[in-house]
Amino acid sequence: MWAKLFLRPSFVNRVHLTWSCRALLTMQLKTKEFESLFTDGLVGLAEIFQKNQFELRIAGGAVRDLLSGKRPEDVDFATTATPEEMKSMFQTAGVRMINNKGEKHGTITARLHEENFEVTTLRVDVQTDGRHAEVEFTTDWQKDAERRDLTINSMFLGLDGTLYDYFQGYEDLKNRKVRFVGSASLRIQEDYLRILRYFRFYGRVAAEPGQHEPETLEAIRENARGLAGISGERIWVELKKMLVGNHAGHLLELVYELGLAQYTGLPADGDVEEMKQVWQRAHVSSPKPMTVLAALFRKQADVENLDQRLKVSREEKNLGLFLVKYRRDLVKGHDEHDTMKPYTDFITDSREPDTQSKVLELLKYQGENKLLDELRRWSIPRFPVSGHDLRKLGYTSGKEIGTILQELRDMWKKSRYQMSKDELLSTLSQS
């Protein structure tokens, strides 16, 4: 197996640490998650780079995941080869290349054995404007690491299992610490979206809320205005990832404390206390991002304003409007034998196809976890009587048929949806 050719057998499930004069921490990794990456496609890719004497390493988030004992969903690669050199050797090897859009950023996507591999040339930032960067290619791994946002995302992993860590990212990962590479202000000013990326990774990595470095929070506060120039779509992508991670309630509170809300579409007068309470009772149920945000909104206009800034989906916007409208009015019933009745009646009466999913989010918002489990198991019953049934009985007036159908539906609901068509129609002959 190709992985075994690369890996040193003396370091099974442990590490070997060395320090170089350039403050490079190296370690030898051998885990089942790492070995599982070596598909026929990756073996073929590695052979091409080895044959042409270019280095190829796993980069960024995939390294972080592997060091955390996870198999990464996406694996990005970095190399000393330029895009032109990659194109030449892939063409020589008969490897198909797809998605040419990434080439200007140094990324070539090669397809081997029905797998896509994104390989990016090492880069340094020449000029940045807070949103995008002009880059030059380099063969210096440390310079590429210096341009990355967080220490835990700045590591490389050789295909022999050697970790290359220039900024103590591995130590930070072990200590569940999130730090910017070098100066937090400089990293943020290169791309202001890194403010929200910091929050997102804090929620993913940190063990507890409130363990931020003071200088990091101050850098975020000083650069908050930079988010005004970031597109709403990019902000929404990061916010959603933050909101489904750990500590989302704490991180949203920081968004307000550090003056970020006004630049991200959130209401200036957001109800932070309500949001903290909702997060406390709802996070165990994995609420959707909009469910958490809805707690900040005091009125439906806040949802509209958020949509204008972030361009949320129609489904997300409708969920926000629904929660703001019904969070106080649609609550569990007083009948101890059927506390779910108001919710099931609402769903049954609704003409919207996704009402049940919205009510599920409402129950998360309200912290009604027992009812949430019940409603997940509940199927929407079908009202057994139609206008056609009434016409067969001799009713002809459309208005009368509509009135009778509503009366029968109310009767059916009171029976907890148990009355059959015959039982319902039989009540007409009794009246």
UniProtKB/Swiss-Prot annotation:
Transit peptide feature range: 1-31
Binding site for Mg(2+): 74, 76
Cofactor list: Mg(2+)
Catalytic activity: a tRNA precursor + 2 CTP + ATP = a tRNA with a 3' CCA end + 3 diphosphate; a tRNA with a 3' CCA end + 2 CTP + ATP = a tRNA with a 3' CCACCA end + 3 diphosphate
Keyword Transit peptide: yes
A single GO BP: mitochondrial tRNA 3'-end processing
Entry's Gene Ontology molecular function annotations: ATP binding; CCA tRNA nucleotidyltransferase activity; CCACCA tRNA nucleotidyltransferase activity; metal ion binding; tRNA binding
Enzyme class: transferase
Binding residues for CTP: 61, 64, 148, 191, 194, 197, 200
Binding site for ATP: 61, 64, 148, 191, 194, 197, 200
Signal sequence segment: none
Keyword Repeat on entry: no
Site (Involved in nucleotide selection): 190
CDD domains: NT_ClassII-CCAase
Site feature May assist in discriminating ATP from CTP, where: 149
Subcellular compartments: Mitochondrion; Cytoplasm; Nucleus
EC number, UniProt record: 2.7.7.72
Pfam family, one: PolyA_pol
Keyword field: ATP-binding, Cytoplasm, Magnesium, Metal-binding, Mitochondrion, Nucleotide-binding, Nucleotidyltransferase, Nucleus, Transferase, Transit peptide, tRNA processing
Database matches in PANTHER family: CCA TRNA NUCLEOTIDYLTRANSFERASE 1, MITOCHONDRIAL (PTHR46173:SF1)
Record text on subunit structure and interactions: Monomer, and homodimer.
Annotated function: Nucleotidyltransferase that catalyzes the addition and repair of the essential 3'-terminal CCA sequence in tRNAs, which is necessary for the attachment of amino acids to the 3' terminus of tRNA molecules, using CTP and ATP as substrates. tRNA 3'-terminal CCA addition is required both for tRNA processing and repair. Promotes tRNA repair and recycling downstream of the ribosome-associated quality control (RQC) pathway by mediating addition of the tRNA 3'-terminal CCA following cleavage by ankzf1 and repair by elac1.
Similarity comment: family membership: Belongs to the tRNA nucleotidyltransferase/poly(A) polymerase family.
Protein name per Swiss-Prot or TrEMBL: CCA tRNA nucleotidyltransferase 1, mitochondrial
Species annotation: Danio rerio (Zebrafish)
Top-level taxonomy: Eukaryota, Metazoa, Chordata, Craniata, Vertebrata
